[in-house]
């Protein structure tokens, strides 16, 4: 039956078109059962036929008879073989199966691999008189059971799942217009962006060597990207281009901390002795080669020579003696060394930012030239007042035709290639991306652009991480599965404030890149996310400026909403010195409880979980983790951290720590030495 002549009683999203048919005067009298509403069905009235019918806003199906839901789990039963058949129909047909149009029988585009039919997620309206409508956790029986585009390997059947995309969201937001300032992703642009970011990293490396004689501090470029995007007003999703101040506090602090030499963790006495000698020698050499005041030269040279003389005559000192002497030397020489290095380090920060702004401008010009209809400056849309369940961010600018991306499989890895550039993801996460795309994308029902968008997504995160071994993965670490399960079961958590399509546990989350990630369930950056109600998990990247901005946003949201709102926050328990974000949360009037998980007694999931080996999936945390419950009054009533719930959460951490698989060496051990 055609949908053109029908009208839905309860339109649920701004992007859905409405028919000319009139709606019933009393929508509640036509409401179907709750389980059908959750699956996207609404009961409508056909003015032409003068009788009711059922319409599914996810699949655009229309039925005269009451739909029958199949109990279908797309992970354990991807073909819907165990789904309950519709009554009085062929058991081989899914619920409401219809004839396929001739256009659907035709082959897909160059990036299509003919996935199973499935609904896309839509927005959901909230009203005071009706309970919240909830989107289906899994689609009903697919109307055209198909096969995977790849051959199943034995590992597929035994693979452990690190996510639960069946959890229904309880996050409520105000309806928003599609984002008009983000350009749709394109492989050509993503390839050029990758080349420019790699070039920028190389410039940073060369500047540190030429001006200060040091290697760039590990992960400092990645944290620079995070810190800059907190305040950046530019258009590029990755490269900062419009920041005030120009000098990055994060990059400046980290480079200065490694001057005159980087201080590493010491285990043995001889290492401590060598480190003390190197520091004294480097400080003296630096003060001699820079434009320092006579007083600074005198202080640094005297302390350096005194330390060297002490090292020559005292060979019985312990490791602690050497470390105490090093700390004393840093206190005496550090301010003078920092003073002579200040202008040079500021020059490094300024040069990198200027190059980034130039690369960003160049990328946008090229990107606009690829679009069929370049966007025009539009007036800001008026704020929407309608409350809806959270849905993925939408782009206002339509996507152009995308070039071909090749897909093949090597053992357990899916390999996607564009112009000779290959990105990889394991089979399990590739299937996860397919599910997320199916639930979230509304402009590509035949998956014609799926492979291109997956390539752009993987390339973006590969470039953000960097090319070093384990580089960047520590900034994308995730909580263990057992902890997520407990958070959902005990505290109603259904949304992650800091995640990505690759490491998310739930199907709804906030992430760094709305342009690439929105097609896979993301709501965009958390600092732009304004929920009215819901229970959220927040495990931010360990960047101090980002965490501080996060706390400000938490308090604003909790102060403005009278609906149940809860944030369970996981941050490093850094105490020497303590981070501003942790101090502010501990003093917040919204803090309801605080837990401390000791170092080496809990784990994180690797940020490289989509490509790493199974025995490298988890790593031990070398720092304690503070768990803070920030809730408004209504959130505290609904999701209070009671002793019983807290005991379950602690037990979940213990369960994850008793894992028998070998643990890789922590990739975040250097974070303790960041100060």
Locate the predicted segments by residue.
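Generic recognition of well-structured, leucine-rich alpha-helical segments
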Residues: 4, 44, 48, 61, ...
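A periodicity- and composition-biased signal for non-globular, repetitive helical segments
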Residues: 57, 104-107, 465-466, 590, ...
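SAM-dependent nucleic-acid methyltransferase catalytic core
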Residues: 271, 285, 292-296, 302-535, ...
């Amino acid at each position: 039956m055609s949908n053109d002549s029908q009208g839905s009683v309860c339109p649920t999203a701004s992007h859905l078109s409405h028919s000319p048919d009139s709606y019933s005067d009393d929508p509640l009298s036509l409401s179907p059962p709750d389980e059908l509403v959750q699956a996207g069905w609404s009961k409508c009235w056909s003015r032409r036929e003068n009788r009711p019918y059922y319409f599914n806003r996810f699949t655009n199906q229309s039925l005269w008879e009451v739909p029958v839901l199949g109990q279908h789990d797309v992970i354990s039963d991807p073909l819907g073989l165990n789904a309950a058949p519709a009554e009085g129909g062929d058991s081989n047909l899914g619920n409401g199966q219809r004839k396929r149009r001739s256009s659907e029988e035709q082959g897909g585009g160059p990036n299509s691999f003919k996935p199973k039919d499935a609904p896309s997620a839509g927005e959901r309206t909230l009203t005071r008189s009706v309970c919240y409508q909830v989107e289906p956790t899994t689609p009903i029986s697919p109307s055209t059971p198909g096969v995977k585009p790849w051959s199943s390997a034995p590992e597929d059947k035994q693979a452990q799942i690190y996510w639960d995309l069946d959890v229904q969201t309880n996050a409520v937001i105000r309806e928003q217009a599609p984002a008009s300032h983000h350009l749709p992703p394109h492989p050509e642009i993503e390839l050029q962006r990758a080349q420019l970011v790699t070039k920028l990293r190389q410039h940073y490396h060369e500047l540190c060597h030429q001006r200060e004689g040091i290697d760039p501090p590990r992960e400092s470029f990645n944290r620079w990207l995070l810190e800059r995007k907190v305040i950046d007003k530019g258009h590029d999703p990755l490269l900062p281009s419009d920041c005030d101040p120009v000098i990055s506090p994060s990059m400046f602090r980290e480079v200065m901390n490694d001057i005159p030499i980087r201080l590493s963790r010491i285990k043995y006495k001889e290492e401590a002795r060598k480190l003390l000698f190197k520091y004294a020698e480097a400080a003296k050499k630096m003060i001699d080669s820079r434009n320092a005041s006579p007083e600074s030269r005198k202080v640094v040279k005297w302390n350096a020579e005194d330390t060297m003389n002490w090292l020559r005559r005292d060979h019985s000192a312990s490791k602690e003696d050497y470390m105490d002497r090093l700390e004393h030397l840093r206190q005496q020489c550090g301010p003078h060394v920092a003073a002579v290095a200040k202008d040079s380090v500021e020059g490094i920060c300024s040069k990198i930012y200027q190059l980034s702004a130039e690369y960003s401008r160049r990328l946008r010009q090229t990107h606009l030239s690829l679009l069929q209809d370049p966007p025009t400056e539009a007036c800001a849309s008026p704020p929407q007042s309608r409350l809806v369940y959270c849905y993925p961010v939408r782009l206002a600018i339509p996507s152009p035709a995308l070039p071909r991306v090749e897909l093949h499989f090597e053992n357990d890895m899916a390999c996607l290639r564009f112009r000779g550039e290959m990105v990889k993801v394991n089979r399990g996460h590739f299937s996860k991306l397919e599910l997320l795309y199916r639930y979230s994308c509304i402009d590509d029902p035949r998956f014609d652009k799926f492979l291109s968008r997956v390539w752009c997504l993987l390339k973006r995160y590969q470039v953000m991480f960097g090319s070093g071994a384990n580089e960047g993965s520590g900034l994308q670490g995730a909580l263990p599965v057992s902890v997520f399960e407990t958070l959902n079961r005990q505290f109603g958590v259904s949304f992650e404030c800091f995640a990505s399509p690759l490491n998310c546990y739930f199907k709804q989350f906030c992430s760094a890149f709305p342009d690439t990630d929105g097609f896979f369930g993301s709501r965009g950056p958390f600092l732009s996310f304004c929920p009215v109600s819901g229970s959220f998990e927040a495990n931010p990247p360990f960047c101090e400026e980002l965490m501080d901005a996060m706390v400000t946003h938490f308090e604003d949201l909790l102060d403005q909403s009278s609906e149940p709102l809860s944030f369970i926050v996981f941050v490093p328990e850094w105490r020497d010195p303590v981070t501003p974000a942790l101090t502010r949360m501990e003093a917040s009037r919204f803090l309801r409880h605080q837990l401390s998980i000791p170092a080496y007694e809990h784990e994180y999931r690797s940020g490289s979980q989509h490509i790493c080996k199974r025995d490298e999936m988890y790593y031990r945390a070398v720092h304690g983790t503070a768990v803070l419950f920030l809730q408004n009054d209504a959130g505290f009533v609904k999701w209070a951290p009671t002793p019983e719930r807290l005991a379950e959460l602690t037990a979940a951490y213990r369960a994850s720590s008793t894992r028998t698989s070998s643990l890789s060496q922590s990739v975040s051990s250097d974070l303790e030495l960041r100060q």
